[in-house]
Regions:
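Membrane-embedded segments
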Residues: 2-86
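Short coil/turn segments at beta-strand junctions that form active-site/ligand-binding loops
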Residues: 23-26, 95-97, 122
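Active-site micro-motifs of SAM-dependent methyltransferase domains
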Residues: 36, 63, 107, 133-134
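A generic structural motif
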Residues: 53-54, 93-94, 121
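Conserved Rossmann-like nucleotide-binding pocket used by diverse enzymes
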Residues: 57, 101, 127
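Hydrophobic pocket-lining residues that define ligand/cofactor binding sites across diverse proteins
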Residues: 87, 91
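Alpha/beta-hydrolase fold nucleophile elbow
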Residues: 93-104
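Hydrolase active-site cap/lid region
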Residues: 109-141
């Protein structure tokens, strides 16, 4: 569990890529949609690891799965930044390039996180799948 600055605890799952992969220094930070939890996205994460040889870090927002709290727009952005900071500070991943990937609700989270961290030279990409730009329509503040 990863603690947030506002004292929630977030569940996460890290899938390491193959040991000597040329993409071993790349981690995809994956944000899921509103329906389900990270467990439902494991097949996608595994496919990314197998096809690209990268690592995948999947975060479960507050109020989803095993994470504590209740979801709202502010909280989801705290969760996203917490995950990003965790990857940037963790010994195993601090030197990795990061691609942020968001599905549906996770796309709105991903866009805001990428905008907030756009000056980080290790943030090298943003992937959006079936997304929208406003979380308020789905998760009220």
């Amino acid at each position: 569990m990863i603690p947030t600055p506002d004292n929630e605890k977030l569940s996460a799952f890290y899938i390491r890529g193959p040991k000597h992969s040329i993409k071993g220094n790349l981690t995809i930070l994956m944000f899921h949609g509103n329906a389900g939890n990270i467990g439902h996205r494991v097949p996608i994460a595994k496919r990314l690891v197998q096809s690209m040889g990268c690592n995948v870090f999947m975060l479960e927002y507050r109020g989803y799965g095993l994470s504590t709290g209740s979801p709202d727009e502010t909280g989801l952005m705290i969760d996203a930044q917490t995950a990003y900071d965790y990857l940037r500070k963790r010994a195993e991943t601090r030197d990795h390039d990061i691609v942020i990937y968001g599905q549906s609700l996770g796309g709105a989270v991903a866009v805001q996180l990428a905008a907030k961290n756009q000056d980080d030279t290790k943030l090298i990409g943003l992937v959006l799948e079936n997304t929208f730009l406003s979380m308020r329509k789905l998760i009220p503040s």
